[in-house]
């Protein structure tokens, strides 16, 4: 959960020029201080992309195999058909060019124990738009409770093929294999999970200060329920996961690094770009307003991904490197994606839902030399991650704050 105060866009200390001319007609009537509609804000600075790098490490296959032998494997389609929660919306979200939305059940809508962050869809997984024959949305939540037990990250599996407006869903707990091959176990994944990206059988989860955690849907396990405080292998040989019925294991990690004196990139969000060649991953970082005011850079990068093994793709020298990088200096960026060379950024504006100027903003720019264009109050309060569905031209996002947790899509081409 992150907060942002409304103020003029910080201009980079490198001397980015502010462009104050209007660039579009307002789409709704708002207070003069927060006039809606697109407006050109500031230029974007290209960076040396190859200075952003990754190193792959994998969970020992023998350990994953031992858990495969100990636990029943199930398919994503099985989990999607096993939804145990039904959403209910009390109102519709105010979203510019809105095309779809749904909610959570009352417990998930109001809880302060978990906060939703990342979103990805089966249109990321496969270009057909379905996985196991179903349209599925995945949303990550991080444990926000102060109960002495850090349960890590859970992922909501929503079955939109069953109902587009009220998809039944179930939470799956992310876990990291541990123990030995003779006594295999697992533990929670204690990260913020600010971004989520699904590619084939792999689920990429943003690890703020570490790069990406990767989870394999070919190893989706059913575990015992009935104990809300137990995790992993128990003394009687049973396996539990805080009363969640299914767990998804981490099978790989991409640890990030930099060269050329660049500061480490915060991995605050991640999305897939299927409109690039090859397919690629878009990563952006969150910086608070005070950090930007103090001169912190805010950057976004593009990294190619290989459709054959679903891993980030190395360059010809064998090193995994970004191929595009930009400095935007946008404060409070919560999500990003790219569509046909145009970048999109969601920006949160605090949690005061009674103030329409607390609604999230959407920013765009056309790479490589376009200026940032602000679409004021286009998203909901607490706007988070972004994901693009090219099969329907849906730009998905979601809200994080209790009581205002819509999951919604807008018509991407309208921005």
Which residues fall in each region the model found?
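Blade-loop segments of beta-propeller domains
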Residues: 102-129, 139-194
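Eukaryote-skewed repeat-based solenoidal scaffolds used as protein-protein interaction platforms
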Residues: 173-177, 184-195, 201-302, 331
């Amino acid at each position: 959960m992150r907060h942002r105060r409304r103020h003029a866009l910080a201009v980079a200390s490198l001397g980015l020029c502010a462009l104050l001319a209007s660039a579009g007609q307002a789409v709704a009537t708002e207070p003069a201080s927060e006039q809606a509609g697109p407006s050109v804000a500031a230029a974007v600075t290209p960076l040396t992309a190859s200075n952003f790098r990754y190193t792959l490490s994998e969970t020992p296959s023998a350990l994953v195999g031992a858990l495969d032998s100990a636990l029943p494997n199930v398919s994503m389609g099985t989990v999607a058909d096993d939804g145990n929660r039904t959403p209910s919306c009390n109102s519709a979200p105010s979203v510019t060019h809105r095309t779809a939305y749904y909610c959570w059940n009352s417990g998930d809508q109001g809880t302060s124990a978990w906060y939703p962050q990342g979103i990805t869809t089966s249109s990321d997984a496969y270009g057909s738009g379905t996985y196991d024959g179903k349209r599925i949305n995945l949303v990550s939540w991080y444990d926000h409770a102060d109960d002495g037990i850090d349960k890590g990250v859970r992922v909501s599996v929503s079955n939109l093929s069953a109902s587009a407006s009220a998809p039944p869903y179930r939470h799956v707990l992310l876990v990291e294999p541990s123990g030995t091959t003779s006594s295999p176990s697992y533990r929670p994944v204690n990260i913020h999970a600010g971004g989520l990206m699904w590619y084939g059988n792999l689920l990429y989860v943003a690890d703020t200060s570490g790069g990406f955690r990767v989870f394999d849907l070919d190893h989706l396990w059913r575990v015992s329920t009935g104990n809300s405080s137990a995790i992993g292998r128990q003394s009687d040989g049973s396996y539990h996961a805080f009363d969640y019925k299914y767990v998804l294991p981490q099978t790989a990690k991409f640890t990030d690094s930099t060269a050329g004196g660049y500061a480490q990139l915060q991995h605050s969000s991640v999305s897939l770009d299927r409109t690039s060649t090859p397919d690629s991953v878009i990563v952006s970082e969150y910086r608070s307003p005070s950090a930007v005011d103090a001169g912190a850079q805010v950057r976004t990068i593009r990294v190619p991904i290989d459709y054959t093994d679903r891993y980030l793709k190395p360059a010809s020298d064998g090193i995994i490197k970004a191929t595009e990088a930009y400095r935007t200096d946008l404060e409070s960026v919560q999500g990003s994606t790219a569509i046909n060379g145009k970048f999109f950024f969601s920006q949160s504006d605090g949690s005061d839902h009674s103030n329409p100027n607390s609604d999230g903003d959407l920013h765009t720019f056309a790479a490589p030399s376009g200026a940032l264009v602000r679409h004021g109050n286009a998203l909901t309060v607490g706007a988070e991650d972004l994901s693009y569905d090219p099969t329907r031209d849906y730009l998905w996002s979601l809200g994080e704050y209790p009581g205002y947790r819509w999951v919604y899509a807008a018509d991407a081409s309208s921005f």
